[in-house]
Amino acid sequence: MFRSMLVRSSASAKQAVIRRSFSSGSVPERKVAILGAAGGIGQPLALLMKLNPLVSSLSLYDIANTPGVAADVGHINTRSEVVGYMGDDNLAKALEGADLVIIPAGVPRKPGMTRDDLFNINAGIVKNLCTAIAKYCPHALINMISNPVNSTVPIAAEIFKKAGMYDEKKLFGVTTLDVVRARTFYAGKANVPVAEVNVPVIGGHAGVTILPLFSQATPQANLSSDILTALTKRTQDGGTEVVEAKAGKGSATLSMAYAGALFADACLKGLNGVPDVIECSYVQSTITELPFFASKVRLGKNGVEEVLDLGPLSDFEKEGLEALKPELKSSIEKGVKFANQ
């Protein structure tokens, strides 16, 4: 997690320096590539990954404007070296040797845009990028941010299968923003410090497929069923809330970048052998009848070390689980069909 530390100098005029760090300890060489680094999510994500001391090489790729982002971020005096790559001809260089690839590429959601609209654009982008990943860094961990994640992760899996390079332990749909929102909203209603809150979120990463398990939230609070229902609904509609608040001028870019950086840090910790790194993610799974499902996973040197059981669910959550399955199943099938057409 991020930690902010305010350092004040008493010898000179009062000055404050905010130092942000993620993890400490052993720091092996790790290359992280961000595909879509010049976009609304990509730029703040690049900044946050530049602040992560676990990253030794930060590779920024996009179809345009990447050199400027790389130059800007590259002036920050942290460990990683930054290189920007632009255009199809440089994608291979951006990917070669990557330990972790984060994909926020694609168009953001706008008011009035349907999921089909989003799918029709972003599915093709993801397909092309994953084809390159399979060729140039087939053993990297993949963090999929590009929406609709419920479909783009199955697309990626199919592309890797075709290339003979699929490792289900290394493909992740980033659902961390759902967890971040659930924690924030729960803390507000439970009147507890948000830093102490944890809420597992299962299912998928869109609308009703997002199912926060407030019955498993810590610390526990005695909230009414009406409040829990409202919290669930707000978590599911969090993306729409931001899109509407920005009035057509963007989607959840900053909070998504923060969530993406949190999950990437967890993946790097796992790669480096830190024990008991557990996060929620949308992965290949057998805990339900669906081939992909978001739940708590234990991260390690090979990516997913273990997909954890769902644990006890309330009656409301059991109903939500059954209700989300048809839509999630349809989204998965849509992705598989696209990848194979």
Curated annotation (Swiss-Prot):
Q: From which source organism is this entry? A: Arabidopsis thaliana
**Gene Ontology CC:** chloroplast; mitochondrial matrix; mitochondrion; nucleus; plant-type cell wall
Enzyme Commission no: 1.1.1.37
The annotated phenotype of a deletion mutant is: Slight reduction of rosette leaf size and reduction by 50 percents in fresh weight and seed production. The double mutant plants mmdh1 and mmdh2 have decreased germination rate, grow slowly, are small, have increased photorespiration and die before producing seeds.
Compartmental location: Mitochondrion matrix
Q: From the Swiss-Prot or TrEMBL record, give the protein name.
A: Malate dehydrogenase 1, mitochondrial
Q: How is its activity regulated?
A: Negatively regulated by ATP. Not redox-regulated. The formation of intramolecular disulfide bonds does not alter enzymatic activity.
Q: Name one GO biological process term.
A: tricarboxylic acid cycle
PTMs? Forms intramolecular disulfide bonds.
Specify which residues bind NAD(+) according to the UniProt entry for this protein. 36-42, 62, 122, 145-147, 256
The residues that hold substrate are: 109, 115, 147, 181
Active site at: 205 (proton acceptor)
Q: Which reaction does it catalyse?
A: (S)-malate + NAD(+) = oxaloacetate + NADH + H(+)
Primary localization class, coarse: mitochondrion
Keyword Chloroplast listed: no
- Xref: Pfam families: Ldh_1_C, Ldh_1_N
Family matches, as Gene3D superfamilies:
Lactate dehydrogenase/glycoside hydrolase, family 4, C-terminal, NAD(P)-binding Rossmann-like Domain
Q: Which family does it belong to?
A: Belongs to the LDH/MDH superfamily. MDH type 1 family.
What is known about what this protein does? Answer: Catalyzes a reversible NAD-dependent dehydrogenase reaction involved in central metabolism and redox homeostasis between organelle compartments. Required for carbon dioxide and energy partitioning in leaves. May limit photorespiration during the dark phase. Its activity is essential to shuttle reductants out from the mitochondria to support the photorespiratory flux. Can convert 2-oxoglutarate to (S)-2-hydroxyglutarate in vitro.
Q: Where is the transit peptide?
A: 1-22
Q: Relate the assembly described in the record.
A: Homodimer.
| A single GO molecular function term of this UniProt record | L-malate dehydrogenase (NAD+) activity
